Every structure is written in structure tokens, then in C-alpha cells.
Design a protein with these regions (language model features):
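Residue-level detector of intrinsically disordered, flexible termini
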Residues: 18-19, 42-43, 162
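N-terminal mitochondrial targeting presequences
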Residues: 14-15, 29-54
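Interaction interfaces in information-processing and related assembly proteins
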Residues: 49-286
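Intrinsically disordered, low-complexity regions
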Residues: 3-7, 24, 166-168, 323, ...
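N-terminal chloroplast transit peptides
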Residues: 1-31
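Cys/His-clustered metal-coordination modules, chiefly Zn-binding fingers
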Residues: 247-349
Length: 349
């Protein structure tokens, strides 16, 4: 369900917003690469600009009547880091940011070591878009084409829906102790991310939710605001609470506008609850971070990728280049392996 945008086209070049509500009464939706090159790619160093919200945060609280659960996210720094690592174009940055925030909304505060993977496989120029997060607020993403940047929508907004295209949204929840992951999928509804996640939550996890995610870029293409929220309607919620929620949410600014203005995750959550109030005795917080892709994990995963080439192909690359350089598609970090390291990896298969 959309709200006020609050974006002045003369002051803000790009505003990316995705929002949806699925209510109990069926409220209508509204709005690892192996390289053969000696050139190292480095993540761009980007600065973030917002007026007071210095730190990214994931915040969860219930309404005072305990009929709603709210998770809110401020993630300007995280999305700026993702933009830099992937060297993403504006629309790709918006799509990456929205999906990272959505994965945080779905994955934070779950059981220990539980992870969630959110994947859009659309036919748009963006290609596959995947975000992975865990219960501690760590999240990372990969994208097929980080340079995807289709023309703006008629309203001047970034056209994330066109970039994603039509296809399948799949969500996989996993835990080391589970025999197999829980997998669910739905058709991509709009490609605008939040609408699709709301439909997934309703159809696959039977949870009614109000979801909004957004990313704002300025004229220099710097991320100036990124955030989102998810309001989950608990099974015993009264009609009065639902009526209030449906009337109140459209009056709110987009989450990216709220973050850009300096609001914290807690302030956003309490603005969403409004007159319902917050049951602060059960609030919880996390600090989201991009990653992790620790070197030890990368080395093991990348050596397996190299070994999968087979001895003949791997040795051919070593003979021609003297090394094999591998890039992690999540963090875009490069690792270089020499002949001795490759030989050990090949012996292990």
C-alpha cells in the first residue's frame, strides 16, 4: 500500500520505492566467477548522506494490544556498500537494496543459524537477483547484471519492475539441523519487490503483512536513504486494529524518505503503529551488516569451484596465466590461487 512520496523532483534525482499490503480481508495491492585476467576489481568506496540516522539497524516490536508485529530496517550504509561492491547502476542499486532489505525483514530474529534466501528469476535485463540473510542481520546479494538501468517510469521513478521482469520468486529457509530446507515460490507479481514479497507471505506462508521497502539516490547517485518495514497481522487481530492499520499506513512517508530525514528504525516502527502504541517490553534490535564472506569460507568454496573445472582445464589455465583468479559473486572479492594450491584442491576430488 503506497503512502506519500515526499520527493521533490528538483532536489532528488532518483527515488525507488516498493510497498504493499495484504490484509486479512484481501486488501488490494497498491503500491562464483572464475576469471582469466590479471586485472583486479576493487569495490568502490562510497559515502552515505543522511541527516541523523548514523547507524543501520533492524528493530522489532509489537503493538501495545499485541495484535501486530512490526520489523523496521534502516540500511543506508549496507545498501551503499552493496552498490559499491557490485558497481551497480541506479535501477540495479534500487533492486539490490530492496531485495536485501526484504531478506532482512524475512530472516532477522529467526532461530539460531537459520538463513533465508530470496531469489527473483525474472526475464528482465537484471537477470537473477538473490539475497541471503541470517538471524543475526547479516545479508549479502548477487545480481546477474548490475548495469541494468531501464528508462524511468512515467512518474519519474526508477523502473525496478521492468528491470526484474516476469518470472518466479522463490524463498528458501534453511537450518543446519533441518533435513531439508523449506522452499516456497510464487509468480513475480510486479517485480517491484515488496508487492511480490507480500504475495509470497500470503500465499506460501499464510501470513498477512504490510510491507514497504525503498532506496533513495541523490543526483550524484549516492545512496541517501534505504529502509523498509513489515507489519505482520497476528491471527487474533481485531477488526478495529485492521481498520486503523489500513487507514494509517497510507499517510506515512516511504521508508527511504523517513530514513533520509534521519528517523531511526525504532522511530519508524513507532510511526507505523501510531495511536496503537508500542509494547516496548518485547522490543529487540540487530545491527545489519553486508556479508559475511570470510576468507576461510571463500577459499574453500572457490577451490571447490576451481576443482570442478577438472584437472585438464585447470592446468591449462595455470600453464597460460600462471594462476587462477576467482571472484565471489556475493562480495566481489578476488582470490588468486597458484599451481600448488590448485593441485591440492584437485587431489581432494
Amino acid at each position: 500500500m503506497g503512502g506519500k512520496d515526499g520527493t521533490n523532483s528538483r532536489e532528488m534525482m532518483m527515488c525507488s520505492r516498493s510497498a504493499a499490503v495484504v490484509g486479512r480481508r484481501q486488501v488490494v495491492l497498491r503500491t562464483t566467477t572464475i576469471q582469466r585476467t590479471t586485472t583486479k576489481r576493487r569495490a568502490a568506496t562510497l559515502t552515505t548522506k543522511n541527516n541523523g540516522n548514523k547507524d543501520d539497524e533492524v528493530y522489532r516490536v509489537m503493538s501495545k494490544n499485541q495484535e501486530l508485529s512490526v520489523i523496521s530496517v534502516t540500511a543506508t550504509k549496507m545498501i551503499a556498500e552493496a552498490q559499491g561492491r557490485h558497481k551497480a547502476a541506479p535501477t540495479a542499486t534500487a533492486a539490490i537494496g530492496r531485495n536485501l532489505i526484504a531478506s532482512l525483514l524475512l530472516g532477522s530474529f529467526k532461530g539460531d543459524e537459520e538463513t533465508v534466501q530470496v531469489t527473483f528469476r525474472g526475464d528482465g535485463p537484471l537477470g537473477q537477483l538473490t539475497a541471503v540473510s541470517d538471524n543475526l542481520g547479516n545479508a549479502k546479494c548477487l545480481v546477474g547484471n548490475a548495469l541494468a538501468d531501464p528508462p524511468l517510469r512515467p512518474d519519474g521513478k526508477l523502473n525496478v519492475g521492468m528491470a526484474v521482469g516476469k518470472g518466479i520468486l522463490s524463498v528458501s529457509r534453511s537450518h543446519p539441523s533441518w533435513v531439508q530446507p523449506y522452499n516456497g515460490q510464487v509468480s513475480i507479481y510486479t517485480g517491484e519487490i515488496a508487492e511480490d514479497i507480500a504475495v509470497y507471505m500470503r500465499d506460501s506462508e499464510q501470513t498477512n503483512s504490510a510491507i514497504s521497502v525503498g532506496v533513495q539516490l541523490d543526483r550524484e547517485l549516492t545512496v541517501v536513504g534505504a529502509g523498509g518495514y513489515m507489519v505482520q497481522v497476528l491471527p487474533f487481530a481485531s477488526d478495529e486494529t485492521l481498520d486503523y492499520l489500513e487507514k494509517h499506513i497510507p499517510t506515512l512517508d516511504s521508508p527511504s524518505t523517513m530514513v533520509e530525514s534521519g528517523m531511526t528504525a525504532e522511530e519508524i516502527a513507532k510511526a507505523i503503529l501510531g495511536d496503537l502504541g508500542a509494547f516496548e517490553e518485547v522490543e529487540t534490535r540487530l545491527t545489519p551488516k553486508y556479508g559475511p564472506c570470510c576468507r576461510e569460507e571463500l577459499e574453500g568454496r572457490m577451490l571447490k569451484a576451481v576443482a570442478s573445472l577438472g584437472r585438464e582445464e585447470a592446468m591449462k589455465i595455470i600453464e597460460e596465466d600462471g594462476k587462477i583468479e576467482v571472484t565471489c559473486e556475493f562480495c566481489k572479492e578476488d582470490l588468486v590461487f597458484n599451481e600448488e594450491e590448485i593441485e591440492k584442491a584437485l587431489q581432494g576430488i
